[in-house]
């Protein structure tokens, strides 16, 4: 390659522990030798978040809003142990949650598939992308124990002063029990719909929304109606032009259909369903180390990509002791490629688009040629049968990817 590809503006967020080490390796070996970026870097490591009172996370989110593309390394969300370990001022919130609250949008998780890595659901030859509506429902509910006999009612008091409406939830006669009130907002459901339709168009795959509207006629019916209305008004012609479709399905039908399908579709889930199904689907494909996570905003223009796993603390402890580490970097690499591919799409940058695709192909081809980290070798042979010759450590694997990328780009005469 005679000169570097001009890549445009990208916001990158550094993270914590083993993934932070890998993040620097990815830039050094796979990105910077080939791509010149206008890079806006934010250190989201736990110490810097603490030093800035988490302002750095908010600044990073605002930068993504401005430049439309963010790539994020995995970060620590502190619990009591972490507060003590790092002597933090307070238990800072999840950076992912903070960024999502500022940007809006929907998180889509997608498996990275290699032919030689066995899947628990062997029929899934294409990814199933799960979009979780990460707002409201059970996660913002008010629930309580009903101590004894009595009525539980829900009331709505209009802010314009008109009369309030009272709904009887249940009349507890013999004993108490439990009760819950939960909600969602039209605006949030509309944003969820737009993000889902945009994702389907960008992947050129059909979209399914799952609800239980036969039981929750008003609540889930609202999701169904809003999706249908937005689809008919704004997306139907585009979907038909790309020969893809949108359908609403009952959640139980959808789970069964997903299990017997070959994959290759977007599945829009309500909050709880998405929480459950995203982990179920991830396990079905074999490994969280091979799972990308992309936040797509309703405008379809703003995207933030990251790995779907954590900071790999156990491996970092080994790294700190100078021991060999065996961390799988693939999902972190794909955070970069998905971010760069989106930058290329926004700027109509064919060279950058080719590079992002080439790097993803190199990752998959290298694994399919038998070069991989221990977690993937264990998927193939079973952990007790894995020998040292079956896998590469983190740094050996990164070197191999770097070598193969150089070869691929040289062959393409980029």
Swiss-Prot record:
InterPro entries, per the entry: IsoCit/isopropylmalate_DH_CS, Isocitrate_DH_NADP, IsoPropMal-DH-like_dom
N6-succinyllysine: modified positions: 126, 400
Expression by tissue: Expressed preferentially in corneal epithelium. Constitute approximately 13% of the total soluble bovine corneal epithelial proteins.
Classification via PROSITE patterns: IDH_IMDH (PS00470)
GO molecular function: isocitrate dehydrogenase (NADP+) activity; magnesium ion binding; NAD binding
Modified residues (N-acetylserine): 2
Signal is among the record's keywords: no
Needed cofactors: Mg(2+); Mn(2+)
Residues noted as binding Mn(2+) in the record, renumbered to the chain: 252, 275, 279
Phosphotyrosine PTM sites in chain numbering: 42
Residue stretches spanning the membrane: none
Binding site for NADP(+): 75-77, 82, 260, 310-315, 328
Keywords, ordered alphabetically: Acetylation, Cytoplasm, Glyoxylate bypass, Magnesium, Manganese, Metal-binding, NADP, Oxidoreductase, Phosphoprotein, Tricarboxylic acid cycle
Catalytic activity: D-threo-isocitrate + NADP(+) = 2-oxoglutarate + CO2 + NADPH
GO biological process: 2-oxoglutarate metabolic process; glyoxylate cycle; isocitrate metabolic process; NADP metabolic process; response to oxidative stress; tricarboxylic acid cycle
Primary location group: cytoplasm
Cofactor note text: Binds 1 Mg(2+) or Mn(2+) ion per subunit.
Pfam families: Iso_dh (PF00180)
Cellular localization per UniProt: Cytoplasm, Cytosol
The protein's role, per its UniProt record: Catalyzes the NADP(+)-dependent oxidative decarboxylation of isocitrate (D-threo-isocitrate) to 2-ketoglutarate (2-oxoglutarate), which is required by other enzymes such as the phytanoyl-CoA dioxygenase. Plays a critical role in the generation of NADPH, an important cofactor in many biosynthesis pathways. May act as a corneal epithelial crystallin and may be involved in maintaining corneal epithelial transparency.
Family membership noted in the UniProt record: Belongs to the isocitrate and isopropylmalate dehydrogenases family.
Protein name: Isocitrate dehydrogenase [NADP] cytoplasmic
Organism of derivation: Bos taurus
Name of the gene encoding the protein in the UniProt record: IDH1
């Amino acid at each position: 390659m005679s000169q570097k590809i001009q890549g445009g503006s990208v916001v990158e967020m550094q993270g914590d522990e083993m993934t932070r080490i890998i993040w620097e390796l990815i830039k050094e070996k796979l990105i910077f030798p080939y791509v010149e970026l206008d890079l806006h870097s934010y250190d989201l490591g736990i110490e810097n978040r603490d030093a800035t009172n988490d302002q750095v996370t908010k600044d990073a989110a605002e930068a993504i809003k401005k430049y439309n593309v963010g790539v994020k390394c995995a970060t620590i969300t502190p619990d009591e142990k972490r507060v003590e370990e790092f002597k933090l001022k307070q238990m800072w919130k999840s950076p992912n949650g903070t960024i999502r609250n500022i940007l809006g949008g929907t998180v889509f998780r997608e498996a990275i598939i290699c032919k030689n890595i066995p899947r628990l659901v062997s029929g899934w030859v294409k990814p199933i992308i799960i979009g979780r509506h990460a707002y409201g429902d059970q996660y913002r509910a008010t629930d309580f124990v009903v101590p004894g006999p009595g009525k539980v009612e829900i009331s709505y008091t209009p802010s314009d002063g008109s009369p309030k409406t009272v709904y009887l939830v249940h009349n507890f006669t013999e004993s108490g029990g439990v009760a819950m009130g939960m909600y969602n907002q039209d605006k949030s459901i509309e944003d969820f719909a737009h993000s889902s339709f945009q994702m389907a168009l960008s992947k050129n795959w059909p979209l399914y929304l799952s609800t239980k509207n036969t039981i929750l006629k008003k609540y889930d019916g609202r999701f169904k109606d809003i999706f249908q209305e937005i689809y008919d008004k704004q997306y139907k012609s585009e979907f038909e032009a790309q020969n893809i479709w949108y359908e609403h399905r009952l959640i139980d039908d959808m789970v069964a259909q997903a299990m017997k399908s070959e994959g290759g579709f977007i599945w829009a889930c309500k909050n709880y369903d998405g929480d459950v199904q995203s982990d179920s689907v991830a396990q079905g494909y074999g490994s969280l180390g091979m799972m990308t996570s992309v936040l797509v905003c309703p405008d379809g223009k703003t995207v933030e990509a990251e790995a779907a796993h954590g900071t790999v603390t156990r491996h970092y402890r080994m790294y700190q002791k100078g021991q060999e580490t065996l961390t799988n970097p693939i999902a972190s690499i794909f955070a970069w490629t998905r971010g760069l591919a989106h930058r290329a799409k926004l700027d109509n940058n064919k060279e950058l688009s080719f590079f992002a695709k080439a790097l993803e192909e190199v990752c998959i081809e290298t694994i399919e040629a038998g070069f991989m980290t221990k977690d993937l070798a264990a998927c193939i042979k079973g952990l007790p049968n894995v020998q040292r010759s079956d896998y590469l450590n983190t740094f050996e694997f990164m070197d191999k990817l770097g070598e193969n990328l150089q070869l691929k780009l040289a062959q393409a005469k980029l």
